[in-house]
Amino acid sequence: MKEKIIKQVGELLPSLVEDIKTICNMDSRQDEAAPGHPFGKRVTDCLNKALEIAGGMGFETENVGNQVGIVSYGPDTEEYLACVGHLDVVDINGVWKTDPFVCTEKDGTLYARGVLDNKGPMFCCLYALKALVDLGYEFPIKVKIIFGTNEETGMEDMKWYFKDHKYPKLGWTPDCKYPVIYAERGRAAFRYSLPREEVGELFAFMNEFVLNQNDLSASLGVDYSDEEFGKNQVRKAELFEDGDTCGLTLVSSYPASYSLDTMKESLEKICKPHMSVSLDSNLDPVFFERDTYLVKTLEHVYEEIMQEDGSAVTTTGGSYAKVVKNIVPFGPSFKGQKGIGHMPDEWMRICDIEKNAQIYAYAFYELMQGL
């Protein structure tokens, strides 16, 4: 079946590339909410276009509240496999050599905002499903491609959708890297707050613990580490002002074994007299045992297609896996491909588009063999 999948993906590749260009030509940055458009009209229009393309391929489609788009195929089973990703994109930064919303092909590479993060990979998953359908494979379980519209700015779309809908039995999000990710760090924001009239304490705190520090986690007393993830990372420190209160927000990318209560207690130890510490927001870590069916199968799939070691790894990144149960990050970036998604001249090679579609089609097939 693997060779048939590889051949079928090759036949579909020209159409896949053209559809990626079409969807990347749409500006889907979040803008102000409007009636019927919770994350702005631009991303709603992009969602509808993606569903229109999928419908034209013969799939069942559903737009759920202009927040989530569902593409379905297979028997009417209660449980389902899923690929979950997003159509919203980050803002334009830096100087681009091409128009970020005119997908440009040059020397076998596509350039556009969202081509890698995450429109291109999601269309690889859509065409992976199409390849299996074209091969006449009889699906034992329903498969869904789930398009989101708010991953970059809060993941409120999936939090909202899964309040009333069943989580997938198994699946992945193509919004990270290869090989399969078995664990993601948590992401927490803590606030040091104090009255505005005590702002001098804030400046003293900044001078002592934040400014000119090479390692914020060490200077703040939260340099915890474990074998799985390594060291806790305080990655951002920003001043804020809120009415009669001011302070500092710290964002930590923390190992799964590090308790938030323990981190908060450590941060409190260095408070100035009028300061307090509070947890402002948190996304829990994602952790799967490495011998689970999902992780082992995706390791095998990667190794079969790429002919190289596919041992599962961890990541500091954050994806829909934090809010959608039973899915892991899997692709699309290959080894050595870093810092592409949010940068100027975002790119994805056509050969990588083809390889991703092969991997995802084979992943759907192999996961269904054990169900």
What kind of region is each of these model predictions?
Residues 273-281:
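Conserved short beta-strand edge segments in small beta-sheet-based binding/regulatory domains
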Residues 2-110:
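Acidic/His- and Gly-rich active-site-bordering loop/insert found
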